Amino acid sequence: MKIDIVSVFPEYFEVMNLSLMGKAQAKGLLEIKAHNLRDWTHDVHHSVDDTPVGGGAGMVMKPEVWSECLDELLGFSQPSGSPAPSGAPVLIFPNPSAPLFTQRDATELSHADHLLFGCGRYEGYDARIPDYYRAQGVDVREYSIGDYVLNGGEVAVSVMLEAITRLMPGFMGNPDSIVEESYTGEGALLEHRQYTKPAVWRGIAVPDVLLSGDHGKVDRFRRDEALARTAEIRPDLIAALDCKALDKADRKTLMALGWEVSAAHPRRLAD
């Protein structure tokens, strides 16, 4: 996968040379390049922002600078009104006002050949930028990573990039480690809690069933704990489950937790 990142702080992404991300690049699974947006400016101050039209606090990133940068990285030979070239990357902007980035999005994007991330700063980028490239046929995505605001898009891009790339074949040393993670699969649940040795630490014991050696009982315990944790922390995920996909033990656990499971989707009895 080829990944281009545009930022006014490209050095922020030197961290991508560490750990599994660095190993993936060394193996040729990833090609990551960070670009400095200021390289496409023409004034002595290398300005990338201007005051907001209509007034207001802060500064807004200028479309002229972004368009020169994106035209080049997207492969537009004739920028004005030309359609997106074949094989153009998916263009992704972090935006706190956009739909939430989810594991489903990460899974979809992990199959892409080329991703281009644009990191906003200040009050953000001119709203016409994503609109323009959508109109040219580019696959433009805008995502939020949560209900909060950051100083810039670099942190959000790092979060999305790690969530996406770790799903690529060959990225993880043990591919089985992602199978039972939180939010994974159609019947997405929060993952069960994890323990390691010693069996008793500071007076707190690992659940006995995990030491039993009975893999069936261990699997059931973990499944029940995942259902219980999800019901408590993210009941919306329980409500999205398909009751037809639940086995008898799942139904029994959910009923004990106060959920009705006779309809298409579980429903809390208190609702």
Curated annotation (Swiss-Prot):
<keyword id="KW-0949">S-adenosyl-L-methionine</keyword>
<keyword id="KW-0489">Methyltransferase</keyword>
<comment type="subunit">
    <text>Homodimer.</text>
</comment>
<dbReference type="InterPro" id="IPR029028">
    <property type="entry name" value="Alpha/beta_knot_MTases"/>
</dbReference>
<keyword id="KW-0963">Cytoplasm</keyword>
<comment type="function">
    <text>Specifically methylates guanosine-37 in various tRNAs.</text>
</comment>
<protein>
    <recommendedName>
        <fullName>tRNA (guanine-N(1)-)-methyltransferase</fullName>
        <ecNumber>2.1.1.228</ecNumber>
    </recommendedName>
</protein>
<feature type="binding site">
    <location>
        <position position="120"/>
    </location>
    <ligand>
        <name>S-adenosyl-L-methionine</name>
    </ligand>
</feature>
<dbReference type="InterPro" id="IPR029026">
    <property type="entry name" value="tRNA_m1G_MTases_N"/>
</dbReference>
<dbReference type="Pfam" id="PF01746">
    <property type="entry name" value="tRNA_m1G_MT"/>
</dbReference>
<keyword id="KW-0819">tRNA processing</keyword>
<dbReference type="GO" id="GO:0005829">
    <property type="term" value="C:cytosol"/>
</dbReference>
<dbReference type="GO" id="GO:0052906">
    <property type="term" value="F:tRNA (guanine(37)-N1)-methyltransferase activity"/>
</dbReference>
<dbReference type="InterPro" id="IPR016009">
    <property type="entry name" value="tRNA_MeTrfase_TRMD/TRM10"/>
</dbReference>
<dbReference type="InterPro" id="IPR023148">
    <property type="entry name" value="tRNA_m1G_MeTrfase_C_sf"/>
</dbReference>
<dbReference type="GO" id="GO:0002939">
    <property type="term" value="P:tRNA N1-guanine methylation"/>
</dbReference>
<dbReference type="InterPro" id="IPR002649">
    <property type="entry name" value="tRNA_m1G_MeTrfase_TrmD"/>
</dbReference>
<keyword id="KW-0808">Transferase</keyword>
<feature type="binding site">
    <location>
        <begin position="145"/>
        <end position="150"/>
    </location>
    <ligand>
        <name>S-adenosyl-L-methionine</name>
    </ligand>
</feature>
<comment type="similarity">
    <text>Belongs to the RNA methyltransferase TrmD family.</text>
</comment>
